[in-house]
Amino acid sequence: MIAPLVPVDIEHELSVVERYFAGDAAQRSAASISSELAGADLVVCDELDFGAMAAAQSAGVPVAAVAVIASGALVRPNRLTDALEALRVGLGTPAPIRPRGDLFVVPFAPAMRDPRFPAPGNALWMRPEPGPAPRTEPYIVATLGTEFNTESGNLFDRILTALARVGTPATVAVGPDLDPARFGPQPSHVRVEQYIDLDAELSRADVVLHHGGSGLFVRSVLGGSAQIVFPMGADQPFTADRVRDLGLGYVLDPVTVTPDAIADAVMSVRADQRVKGRVEALRRETLALPTPSTVVARLQAPANSAAREQ
């Protein structure tokens, strides 16, 4: 079943981080990890796992938080003060919870981050896995992820109608919860699948249509693809802002966009050499970041210090 589309409510998405990730989910995470910390030298968690950060801090274990939001705009520490204070009190931790850990690993290029929400001073920039080298051709990949795919109304149908009109080879990944057969017969140049090897497919694609998840954003850049984004929730509207502001493609309203508008956007963005140049420049910037092994060496310093103190 696919739920109807609703307009993006940015305030709601921000409040989910505050009420859920820094609230109920953090309480549960802290409770589950606390018993595992004896003898630990370092805790590595994603930037939304405030419970792991709090439990580690309470136990005196250094924390490396890993950014998972490319734009940096979804997680706003100034909105988390009350929730993190409740978490601190519950754990009996004397000092305020540090919502960025001791080190903050960022596997995205600095330009991908919204300048209104800069990385903290303890940031370690890290190159993501490069994936296959781009060999772009007239080929389109479309996906709406594995959560918002079932909250997308008739957006898949509109995308498929647009791809039929464009006429170049395309693959649409609908996710594990949807049967490709529900979308009916498609032209021979359009393939509908539950799963695809995204890295392999993105390295071929000159255009990627997606929902705006941070992972698809960075993987599309590394694949050398222009992007058309249909933001529906979570961090997606902020990712869409970066795609637009960096000139990497177009942002379309998932609620109102027509098949003709989608097709026109595909043909326009693939013909724009300026977009291709910006994508390639950002790809080079991303690949020039410090390697994971370099970052791991930096992470070992606080871990070794903690081990000596035990």
Please place each PLM-identified region on the residue numbering.
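Nucleotide-activated sugar donor-binding and catalytic core shared by glycosyltransferases
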Residues: 66, 73-82, 86, 94-95, ...
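Structural motif
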Residues: 41-42, 103, 139, 207
